Regions:
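Ribosome-associated RNA-binding proteins
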Residues: 1-185
Length: 185
């Protein structure tokens, strides 16, 4: 939203609708280890150090005999970041991938995702030999004001088509706010 000041009067007029502003709703950082036990605990410690908050564990949805995974066994951990913490982590995470994303990383609903092969690529992260190196997925969700109506408890409703965040809106937000270069896949 632009703010224009008229010369001499000191009055400010706003251009643009504040309801149309796109904002970062949340960032999810996810590490999938594929097995429970010591490796999962190490991944939790790494995620705790990187995000600054305690991660939760996720269980396997079904049994996969080829990989030795049983249904209900904890195999992954994730942290959901919101607000300023999400903005700060996303800036650091994008530096790990050279501030560039593919257009295919954005979906039609204003979400984006990218992978980081080694957590030590994130600026400010040090290698700890006892923990090892983990890769992670970073997923972001973009929203506009008014998206609460689909999550509220009483009389939830749908977001209208004109108000939804599209792929183009998401690309424009990421290039403008975070300086991301979007490559055509």
């Amino acid at each position: 939203m632009e703010t224009v000041t008229e010369t001499g009067t000191g009055a400010e007029t706003q251009i643009g609708n504040p309801m149309r502003e796109v904002k970062l709703a949340k960032v999810i950082v996810h590490i999938n280890v594929g097995k429970s036990g010591e490796m999962l605990e190490k991944a939790r410690r790494v995620l705790n150090e990187i995000t600054g908050q305690k991660p939760c564990t996720k269980q396997a949805k079904r049994t996969l005999k080829e990989f030795g995974i049983r249904e209900g066994e904890p195999i992954a951990c994730l942290s959901t970041l919101r607000g300023e913490r999400a903005n700060q982590f996303l800036k650091r995470g994008l530096e790990a991938v050279s501030n560039s994303l593919k257009r295919s990383s954005f979906d039609e609903n204003g979400n984006f995702a990218f992978g980081i092969k080694e957590h030590i690529e994130i600026p400010g992260t040090k290698y700890v030999p006892e923990l090892g190196i983990f890769g992670m997925d970073v997923m972001g969700t973009l929203e506009r004001r008014g998206y609460r109506i689909k999550r509220r408890r009483i009389r939830p409703s749908r977001i209208g088509k004109a108000h939804r965040v599209t792929q183009e809106d998401a690309v424009k937000f990421m290039t403008g706010t975070f300086g991301v270069q979007v490559k055509e896949a």
